[in-house]
């Protein structure tokens, strides 16, 4: 073995464990076909594509290729209430998908279910698995996340699809890598990163922002990510035309609500400082904020989605908005699915729900009016807005953010996170674009340079 071959062998780059795609529907765009071909050839891959770029078509085409190659079955895991949408999208491709809630369907080739129902299924009955909106895996508790990862480990073909705001959470990238069998997130952290501080809590160790790249590892890290994942916000990120994928204008308006009474023990209203005071202010201004949100929702005759975070908010909003329907955590899965379906079909004008319930995976291009109660989570805000502001939306999307005076810092924090996420994704896409053109050269063994006078 030469020295160059020795160094080549030490590089950690994912290989191919798939096959050449034979099923590429004519309705796919060129970049979608390219991603299907790439993911099928990889066998185990991740696609980080922004909202509205057709991830459902991509994953269904990939799953059909696995079915035709292995004559086996593929399980498609999706967030709650997204299953019916996946089945509908499959019909557009001429594919028959079965929505199985309890693992009793044994003959269907393409099976759709929810993450929460994974325990009903046996991996021995499948040859491939798709995790739709895989970024929500980090929202599950450790037991559920471990069960999903262990289920995937037993299958030969694996695909992750998500439209996360920006894959700048290194832990999430490590979790994705572990799920598809490339490298565990603990191994990833020890190989490419070092802790910012030596003293950390166990909770801090699961926050990607507390790690930084080792001095030599950043380029190698993104080369490794490129070996099993593709990230894109628009087709041009992969060298294709953006003509059919133009986002409509987005108008964001902030509405600040003042409390009618000061905090207990105060003579006049003071800005909320810290999380505890912000929460107290939210509960104290519950009525005022809901009145403002209801006024905004009632001013539209078109569909509106109102995003809240507290149960009392949802209950009061439903009372203040005459034709509103609420989806809450205590609802049965069947009721959640039916309500989301009715809203998508236009049978419900105003939908009230929480981002953690309905902000992932659903397509609501028919709705262009959003009312949002902010929190510190940028991902929830991003995903909530992108249910409506996505490719395929024909109208200007209006987002009304209803906040208290004490939440100005929260909005500033969201803007800071948005700028950081945009910069991170810009850097990531640029690095991926460069890495796709990398030619491996021997830059370590060079000829000795001899002075010209010798």
Could you describe each region identified by the protein language model?
Residues 56-61, 71-92, 167-172, 309-311:
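Conserved Walker A/P-loop ATP-binding site and its immediately adjacent core
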Residues 81-104, 182-183:
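Conserved helix-turn-beta segment of the N-terminal RecA-like "Helicase ATP-binding" lobe
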Residues 8-48:
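Conserved pre-motif I regulatory segment
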Residues 71-73, 92, 128, 136, ...:
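Conserved P-loop NTPase motor "coupling/switch" region that bridges the ATPase
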Residues 281-309:
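Conserved interdomain hinge at the start of the Helicase C-terminal
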Residues 376-454:
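A conserved SF2-helicase RecA2
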Residues 42-62:
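Walker A/P-loop
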Residues 305-307, 315-316, 322-358:
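Conserved helicase ATPase core of P-loop NTP-dependent helicases/translocases
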């Amino acid at each position: 073995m030469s020295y160059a071959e020795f160094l080549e062998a030490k590089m950690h780059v994912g290989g191919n464990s798939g096959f050449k795609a034979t099923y590429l529907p004519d309705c796919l765009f060129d970049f979608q076909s390219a991603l299907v071909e790439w993911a099928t050839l990889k066998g185990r891959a991740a696609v980080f594509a922004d909202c509205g770029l057709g991830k459902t078509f991509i994953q269904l085409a990939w799953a059909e290729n696995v079915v035709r190659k292995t004559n086996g079955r593929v399980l498609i895991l999706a967030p709650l209430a997204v299953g019916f949408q996946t089945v509908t999208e499959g019909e557009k491709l001429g594919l028959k998908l079965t929505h199985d809630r309890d693992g009793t369907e044994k003959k269907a080739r393409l099976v759709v279910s929810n993450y929460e129902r994974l325990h009903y299924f046996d991996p021995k009955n499948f040859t491939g698995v798709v995790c739709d909106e895989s970024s929500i895996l980090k929202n599950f508790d450790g037991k559920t996340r471990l069960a999903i990862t262990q289920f995937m480990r037993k299958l030969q073909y694996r695909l992750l699809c998500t439209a996360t705001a920006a894959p700048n959470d290194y832990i999430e990238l490590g979790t994705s890598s572990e799920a598809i069998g490339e490298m565990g997130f603990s191994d990833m952290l020890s190989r490419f990163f070092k802790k910012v501080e030596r003293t950390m809590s166990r909770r801090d160790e699961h926050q990607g922002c507390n790690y930084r790249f080792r001095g030599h590892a950043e380029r190698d890290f993104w080369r490794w990510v490129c070996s099993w994942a593709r990230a894109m916000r628009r087709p041009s990120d992969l060298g294709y035309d953006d003509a059919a994928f133009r986002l409509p204008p987005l108008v964001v308006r902030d509405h600040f609500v003042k409390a009618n009474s000061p905090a207990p023990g105060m003579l006049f209203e003071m800005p909320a400082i810290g999380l505890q005071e912000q929460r107290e202010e939210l509960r104290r201004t519950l009525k005022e904020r809901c009145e403002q949100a209801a006024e905004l929702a009632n001013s539209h005759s078109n569909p509106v989605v109102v995003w809240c975070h507290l149960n009392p908010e949802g209950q009061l909003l439903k009372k203040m908005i005459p034709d509103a329907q609420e989806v809450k955590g205590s609802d049965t899965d069947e009721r959640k699915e039916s309500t989301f379906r009715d809203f998508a079909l236009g049978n419900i004008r105003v939908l009230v729900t929480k981002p953690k319930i309905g902000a992932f995976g659903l397509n609501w291009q028919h709705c262009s009016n959003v009312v949002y109660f902010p929190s510190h989570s940028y991902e929830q805000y991003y995903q909530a807005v992108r249910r409506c502001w996505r490719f395929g939306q024909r109208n200007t999307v209006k987002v009304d953010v209803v906040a208290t005076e004490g939440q100005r810092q929260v909005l500033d924090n969201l803007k800071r996170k948005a700028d950081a996420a945009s910069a991170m994704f810009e850097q990531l896409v640029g690095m991926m674009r460069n890495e796709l053109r990398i030619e491996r050269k021997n830059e370590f063994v060079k000829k000795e340079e001899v002075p010209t006078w010798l």
